[in-house]
UniProtKB/Swiss-Prot annotation:
The protein's name: 1-deoxy-D-xylulose-5-phosphate synthase
Native source organism of the sequence: Cupriavidus necator (strain ATCC 17699 / DSM 428 / KCTC 22496 / NCIMB 10442 / H16 / Stanier 337)
Gene Ontology process terms (BP): 1-deoxy-D-xylulose 5-phosphate biosynthetic process; isopentenyl diphosphate biosynthetic process, methylerythritol 4-phosphate pathway; terpenoid biosynthetic process; thiamine biosynthetic process
This protein's encoding gene: dxs
Protein family membership: Belongs to the transketolase family. DXPS subfamily.
Pathway membership, UniProt: Metabolic intermediate biosynthesis; 1-deoxy-D-xylulose 5-phosphate biosynthesis; 1-deoxy-D-xylulose 5-phosphate from D-glyceraldehyde 3-phosphate and pyruvate: step 1/1
HAMAP family: DXP_synth
Catalytic activity, EC: 2.2.1.7
CC cofactor note: Binds 1 Mg(2+) ion per subunit. Binds 1 thiamine pyrophosphate per subunit.
SUPFAM superfamilies, sorted: Thiamin diphosphate-binding fold (THDP-binding), TK C-terminal domain-like
Cited NCBIfam families: dxs, PRK05444.2-2
Enzyme class: transferase
Amino acid sequence: MTYALLNKIDAPADLRKLDRRELRTLADELRAYVLESVSQTGGHLSSNLGTVELTIALHYVFNTPDDRLVWDVGHQSYPHKILTGRRERMGTLRQWGGISGFPRRSESEYDTFGTAHSSTSISAALGMALGARTLGEKRVSVAVIGDGAMTAGMAFEALNNAGVYKDLPLVVVLNDNDMSISPPVGALNRHLARLLSGQFYAATKKGIEKVLSVAPPVLEFAKRFEEHAKGMMVPATLFEEFGFNYIGPIDGHDLNSLVPTLQNIRERALEGAGPQFLHVVTKKGQGYKLAEADPILYHGPGKFNPAEGIRPAAKPARKTYTQVFGDWLCDMAAADKRLVGITPAMREGSGMVEFERRFPDRYYDVGIAEQHAVTFAGGLACEGLKPVVAIYSTFLQRGYDQLIHDVALQNLPVVFALDRAGLVGADGATHAGAYDIAYLRCIPNMMVMTPSDENECRQLLTTAFHQACPSAVRYPRGSGPGAAIAAELTTVPVGKGVMRREGGARAGHRVGFLAFGSMVHPALGAAEALDAAVADMRFVKPLDVELVKRLAAENDYLVTVEEGSVMGGAGSAVLEALAEAGIDKPVLTLGLPDRFVDHGDPAYLLQQCGLDAAGIERSVRERFGLDQPKVTVASRVA
């Protein structure tokens, strides 16, 4: 496809020069460009195909970047990036040194607020609107938020706060596509569904919008009639109770409705009409039939051929840790009827699809509501159930107070299965599970476990399930080293690591590795060259202090290795144990550095952090002044 119009758009100012009749053609080109780009790099697809017209309309109507535009979550921001000067860089999307898959302030002035976690946009836009008022600047702040993100309490905290300011130029656009990642759940979603299913109300609104598109909504009769229709069909609509002027729902793919409606909203906002709430209805995957039919499959695909679609991949030789967890969850649930599973809107990503199918009455999707998920699990535990919360490491941060106050303080036996622990690759720093060891091990009553392979993951999950205290098992994205997985649900001794390699002193020194989780196997690789001992510590808390003491006694140097923040992490726990025991020993702590690690290929990112086998060996030799191994070349006799 040729991109005759799109190639002329290097900034929204170029977009605003187009005749409105050209926007439909531009939308077709932009949608095709998104599909072409994502098919070549991988990335989020369905959500971006669904926001093409909305993105065009927003930049056409609002004076960005002076008007502030905030994308909630941000995985739907590819059309925005393309229209704001990054079209030619889409080939670098989510790659090392390339553009991010999410809005990033350092990347463009049009990315007014960095996002990636959900439900933050209204708070940020409200802050920007009040900031502009404080500075005496006249502009509109716009938050674009999906219906899935509206299940989080933070969004309603912001709505509640914003409604106080009756003349504030703030606009919230609800992008209602009936999807978060997993289908959204809860009373709010049902409320929106009822809005859409009311035929008389929809017909009445259509008539009102026709009036308002001809004349701005200054006609008192039109305003009264609109309020009357709303009052009859949807009493005291939720968003108006928060102090917003509610408009919609309207078709989010109809530029002839979007543009004039947004123009009226912007005018009213600047005139002091107060916070405005526009409800648009879009379709995930719009314009690409395969994505429309299966928006979950096309939510975040890798590279694929658009003409053929995503082909089923050959069955991998090794299971992912997510699959290991999903299998364990079903097996454990079959063995113990007290088990209940909880996910904050990540059924597919957390490996709970089969569990929901087999145990629907014991499966709880609470929506994008991590705070609620943690305390809800605590309540279930109070009744004698055994809750397992499947959650990405980065998202548990959102429920930290509840973790301390509602679970750990009461010593409730909740299991947290922390997926995506460590680096996550293309999603970058916003999704990396870099901090869970540091923020969990400081909590009293908390047990923290780090499996090094698939079978150990199953064993540690079983061990966690049988504890009478809160516990967390952290495991990385992707597949493990390929360990055979035993069918039995066996436990391991609490607080005990295991030796994986006994060391020697080939070079006149002894090195002992204390490796945690995913770093056990890279440490084993480095240990071969160093003739070092390697302990698979398994537990960060309770730490195997006796094993620490043994390694300290048997080695000249100690090295801790973890795929987590080196500040406050497992290495710090080892140093504390040595200090408590009065042991003075040279220790090198290796882990993720004190910086946010960017997006890119996971193996390359680990290499950049010095956490591959070669990097670990190099760091040990440099830190302790060990000689490089001599390379001998054997002569060949003909």
